[in-house]
Amino acid sequence: MTDLLRHAVVRPLAQHWLSNSRSSWRSLTSPESSGSVSVPGPDPDRILLVGGGISVGWGMSSHDDALGGYLARSISTATGRGTVIDVVTDDILSGSAELPFRVTRILRTADAVVITPGDVDAILFLPGAIYRRRLENALDQMTAAGPANMRIFIVATPPLRTVIALPRVFRPWAARLGAALNDRARQLCRERRNTIFVPFSPSGIAGREGTGRTYSAWAELIAPSVARQLDSCNDRSIR
């Protein structure tokens, strides 16, 4: 599919569906765009969860009941320590030259950052080169703003059929584009010592019917990679 066809035909159709379909997440409630969740315990890890898509918490009124809360509890279970997760649902791949101030402020004391892909219409219509450039820009700024030992985790763009009930006509190109974006993200992670790619292929009910019942399962797919890296940082200086 050419970029011209993608932007001239497919993108408007997909945006119309996302705005009007009863299967879309858009009409669901969601928490405030930023918030904090915590699990008490010794020597707590401080984590920034940032991005659109699954971080937003569609279907929930509180981040404690959405991905942020479940991720904090899963990581604490694995590490035996406390966990504090600051959730910022700004789409850092939107093309803005600079990260929002609230993101850079949190980064100053973060042990780890978990980046989730943005909304389907913001991500899957990006040419691969632009996606890589925007992601690289965000990673450069995060690395500069955070402590030297901070780890950054890029959660894969999932097969969209597993998180949203896409119309059949969109599924083939969505699968191809998602795979291409993940290839770009993996390449960036290989080039950076502090950046880890986290595979993410959930199962279960997609779309509105699954939202709110799947955050626990999604967190279980992400938490092990984060917990292992946090446990491996024996020289953490920001505790």
Say what each PLM segment does.
Residues 63, 126-134, 169-180, 210-217:
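Alpha-helix N-cap and loop-to-helix initiation/capping positions
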